[in-house]
């Protein structure tokens, strides 16, 4: 079950997958296979023809291995910037090309390789985590099945399968099963077991929790890697403001940066001066506001006092006017009385005069 699941999980291909390690085990295994096949070969012309065909195949394989090794060495030299050996002509051509390629292109290639490595490592880590998850699920299911009782295939069937495999191995030893057929058989067996095995509704929450925990762990590690990458970029001297440019543009950029820094310092000093002036003006304005408020209060108090005085004067004048008006009316009445008496007195005089005149005649 575990091998089938591991084969089902997709794995990411890296640029180091092409690199092959030379080991004597492959040659020993090939020699053993050749000896085994030659020992079991039939005598006669058919055996000789087979041996010739095997020798041709071996020569082709050796040529392919040499080509793959040369390509792997070239890839190693490109990846790690090593000086390749001068043995093979293809490596010499690669050395000439690496010398002719400019430094800028090499650095760009190196950055691209770094990005690819980061992506590949993250993908491989996720794939490994998925594999571990699936394996843990399978182990959990197997342990639960073992605890509840063997719900799978009975032992008689297992024994029959083993006997069949032994018989097949004894009969068809020279035949080899390809990887694809083996994986397809494992997949079919897994599907049949999944169909046979009853669903586990109680364990869905457990697996969901496992997946959530794994996703959280992946996110945390990605954040940590990102933060470490950012800090390393800022800490490394490669992050310094000196990119590899042509025609001495780095010096020009340095001078411009220095000028900008000087301008920034000047602007900061000007801003500090203006801040001090602004504080002084603010203090003065606050003082003026206080003075104006005090002056307004004084003016208001004086005006109120004047209004009170005027009101008192008005009251006094109204009293005087009323008294004068009463005296005037009294005088008018007196004048009227005197006029009436005068009229009476004048009338008496006229009557006396007329009487005297009549008496004198």
UniProtKB/Swiss-Prot annotation:
GO terms for cellular component: Golgi apparatus. It is found in: Golgi apparatus. One of its GO terms (biological process) is signal transduction. Keywords: Coiled coil, Golgi apparatus. Residues 35-48 have a biased composition (Low complexity). Residues 22-111, 140-183 are annotated as: Disordered. Residues 51-79, 246-296, 326-346 form a coiled coil. Residues 158-168 have a biased composition (Basic residues). PANTHER family: G KINASE ANCHORING PROTEIN 1, G KINASE-ANCHORING PROTEIN 1. Belongs to the GKAP1 family. May play a role in the regulation of insulin-dependent IRS1 tyrosine phosphorylation in adipocytes. This is G kinase-anchoring protein 1-A. The gene is gkap1-a.
């Amino acid at each position: 079950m575990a091998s089938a699941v591991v084969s089902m999980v997709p794995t990411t291909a890296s640029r180091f997958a092409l690199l092959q390690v030379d080991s004597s085990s492959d040659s020993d295994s090939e020699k053993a296979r050749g000896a085994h096949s030659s020992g079991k070969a039939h005598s006669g012309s058919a055996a000789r023809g087979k041996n010739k065909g095997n020798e041709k195949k071996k020569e082709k394989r050796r040529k392919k291995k040499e080509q793959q090794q040369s390509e792997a060495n070239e890839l190693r030299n490109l990846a790690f910037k090593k000086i390749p050996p001068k043995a093979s002509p293809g490596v010499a051509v690669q050395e000439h090309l690496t010398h002719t390629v400019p430094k800028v292109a090499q650095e760009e290639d190196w950055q691209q390789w770094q990005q690819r490595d980061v992506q590949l490592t993250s993908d491989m880590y996720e794939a490994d985590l998925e594999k571990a998850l699936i394996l843990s699920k399978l182990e959990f299911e197997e342990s639960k099945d073992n605890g509840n009782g063997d719900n799978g295939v009975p032992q008689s069937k297992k024994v029959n399968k083993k006997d069949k495999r032994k018989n097949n191995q004894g009969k068809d030893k020279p035949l080899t099963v390809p990887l694809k057929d083996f994986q397809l058989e494992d997949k079919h067996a897994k599907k049949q077991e999944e169909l046979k095995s009853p669903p586990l509704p109680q364990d869905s929450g457990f697996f969901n929790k496992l997946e959530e925990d794994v996703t959280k762990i992946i996110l945390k590690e990605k954040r940590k890697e990102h933060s470490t990458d950012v800090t390393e970029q800022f800490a490394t001297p490669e992050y310094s403001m000196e990119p590899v440019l042509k025609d001495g543009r780095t010096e020009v950029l340095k001078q411009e940066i220095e000028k900008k820094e000087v301008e920034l310092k000047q602007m900061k000093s000007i801003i500090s001066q203006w801040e001090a002036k602004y504080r002084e003006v603010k203090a003065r304005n606050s003082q003026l506001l206080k003075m104006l408020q005090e002056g307004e209060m004084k003016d208001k108090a004086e005006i109120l006092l004047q209004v009170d005085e005027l009101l008192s004067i008005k009251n006094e004048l109204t009293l005087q006017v009323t008294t004068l008006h009463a005296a005037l009316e009294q005088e008018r009445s007196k004048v009227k009385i005197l006029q009436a008496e005068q009229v009476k007195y004048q009338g008496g005089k006229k009557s006396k005069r007329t009487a005297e005149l009549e008496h004198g005649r």
